[in-house]
Amino acid sequence: MSQAATPAADGKVKISIDPLTRVEGHLKIEVEVKDGKVVDAKCSGGMFRGFEQILRGRDPRDSSQIVQRICGVCPTAHCTASVMAQDDAFGVKVTTNGRITRNLIFGANYLQSHILHFYHLAALDYVKGPDVSPFVPRYANADLLTDRIKDGAKADATNTYGLNQYLKALEIRRICHEMVAMFGGRMPHVQGMVVGGATEIPTADKVAEYAARFKEVQKFVIEEYLPLIYTLGSVYTDLFETGIGWKNVIAFGVFPEDDDYKTFLLKPGVYIDGKDEEFDSKLVKEYVGHSFFDHSAPGGLHYSVGETNPNPDKPGAYSFVKAPRYKDKPCEVGPLARMWVQNPELSPVGQKLLKELYGIEAKKFRDLGDKAFSIMGRHVLVAEETWLTAVAVEKWLKQVQPGAETYVKSEIPDAAEGTGFTEAPRGALLHYLKIKDKKIENYQIVSATLWNANPRDDMGQRGPIEEALIGVPVPDIKNPVNVGRLVRSYDPULGCAVHVLHAETGEEHVVNID
């Protein structure tokens, strides 16, 4: 992992961090800094995936197992999208108990993923760990809680409060994995979700075991996670003004609440150019103008006719990530998008602490205004969505029917198409499946990472992370901590140590971005 800071004649300094993440490919971030702020940014995916090619010619039912290997953090999301695409193509309607069982599997994965995001991928940007590996070496000018809070005793107490939760969160995540495995067979890479529903018929004993584990997770979210996030935000108030971006969001909807998939816990929708719109799948296109891919015709392609033709030598390209657009506009996806579209009530803890710590009267999510689109706003909404998911899991546990059927048998059609729309913890996810002669003829995946971490499109518009980086403060080019904070607020699963090499002196600076 390396980072180079290169001076330029116009007073800019280019900082290149490569790779910035280990999950879902290698993410490279390049920013140009002038007068202590980012003035330009490029987000590059440096590894070709090619899962679409792997799936061609296979039994359609294989897809839900193969696509889970895309990501070890959210395989359940890819499985969900895949089986929904198969349900659509096979013409099968899942039973009520099958739908609820799927929600319980996926809901537990949501809880785990969100807790992972903050505590083990982002928290050490703010909380100081002990002076032992892997917490050291740490970079200078880290701007941690212990640096921000001037009262030494209060600083140490607040930092210890956060660090203790960091350790406890490991245990909570293990419990969430057990919850997934109880109905999903195992975690990661669940086996219990298939076309037609779920393979596990819940029993009263299993429901009780799941519920007992869930209570511990729910208690952690309410009593520890939410209070820590709001306490952290009260210290880093400037990060509620940083990383705003395009302010366009899109959500596909997740956790169906009826058997016809007409209502969802978090509904589909679009907020673009300051207006709410209904989601129309026909308006989704992928562009490759600055991606290492070729299209057979100019312009963007709808996912149903999508092409995956790699060209690593393409002039002007800088990423193996395509550029999805809605109405030709870049859109952010993830908890921010879902919560903005749904606009649910904030948790009682959140409403109370916003008033006590910030002096803000906020009942619903949109009451936060532009603060929601910031670095710290994203962390707040992830915590709030974790609470909202926990409330839903508690409801589903009351709805699930022990002993009731969860699976509907179906046959592979000779020819068919199907699309699965859902939401990974990181954001909007779709899988498109085309069957010919009972085999997969075409398979296309538009993942959350594509939506958020994409490069410029054919029109020259920056991707969401690229745009959000503009204006981010970088007072010390050797320690661009806010660049890492911004990218991590999108949950791209980071965990690396970065070295900065000064282009003129050759001096090396260790930059820990864990």
Swiss-Prot record:
The protein's Enzyme Commission number: 1.12.99.6
Positions of Ni(2+) binding: 71, 74, 493, 496
Compartmental location: Periplasm
Gene Ontology cellular-component terms listed: periplasmic space
Listed cofactors: Fe cation; Ni(2+)
Xref: InterPro entries: Ni-dep_hyd_lsu, Ni-dep_hyd_lsu_Ni_BS, NiFe-Hase_large, NiFe/NiFeSe_hydrgnase_LSU
SUPFAM superfamilies: HydB/Nqo4-like (SSF56762)
Catalytic class of the enzyme: oxidoreductase
Any one GO molecular-function label of the UniProt entry: hydrogenase (acceptor) activity
UniProtKB keywords: Iron, Metal-binding, Nickel, Oxidoreductase, Periplasm, Selenocysteine
Residue numbers binding Fe cation 2: 52, 445, 499
Keyword Metal-binding: yes
Cofactor binding notes: Binds 2 irons ions. Iron 1 has 3 cyanide and carbon monoxide ligands. Iron 2 has 3 water ligands.
Catalytic reactions of this protein: H2 + A = AH2
Homology family: Belongs to the [NiFe]/[NiFeSe] hydrogenase large subunit family.
Other facts noted in the record for this chain: Perhaps the leader of the small subunit serves as a transport vehicle for both subunits.
NCBIfam families: H2_NiFeSe_large, NiFeSe_hydrog
Protein name: Periplasmic [NiFeSe] hydrogenase large subunit
